[in-house]
């Protein structure tokens, strides 16, 4: 599993608590070196590694991104979506089985005053279907505006 935008390692922690270490190999990536430092000292084990970066270094069965693209570094929606699509394309190249990511959504793409990116679900699906193939979405009623996108090879 590659976890892009791993932050403080919440997904690694979840896997550690719910699976035996022989059941998974996890590699967390983040562009923030402080997050990687924190995770590298918190999580010890041959099956868990952390690296500075924004994409996997090798093929992985699953590439996940949870909340990775919610905080935009620009107010320019087209620029942010170009960045998002470029990152998704790079990650897809390393996904052997599936790529899974979530985004905040609204009827029209926008970036809030707090720099939270809200995607138009149809725009994301159209991009993913045209570049990667059939794309499924999951909505959880308890997470308003959150949509998880899954693309399986």
Where are these regions (language model features)?
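A short SAM/SAH-binding and catalytic strip from SAM-dependent methyltransferases
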Residues: 62-81
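Class I S-adenosyl-L-methionine
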Residues: 112-153
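Conserved beta-strand signature within the Rossmann-like core of class I S-adenosyl-L-methionine
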Residues: 95-103
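Class I SAM-dependent methyltransferase SAM/SAH-binding core
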Residues: 10-49
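Short, conserved SAM-binding segment of the class I
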Residues: 83-90, 94
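Short "lid" loop at the C-terminus of a central beta-strand within the Rossmann-like core
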Residues: 69-71, 104-109
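Class I SAM-dependent methyltransferase "Motif I" SAM/SAH-binding loop
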Residues: 5-9
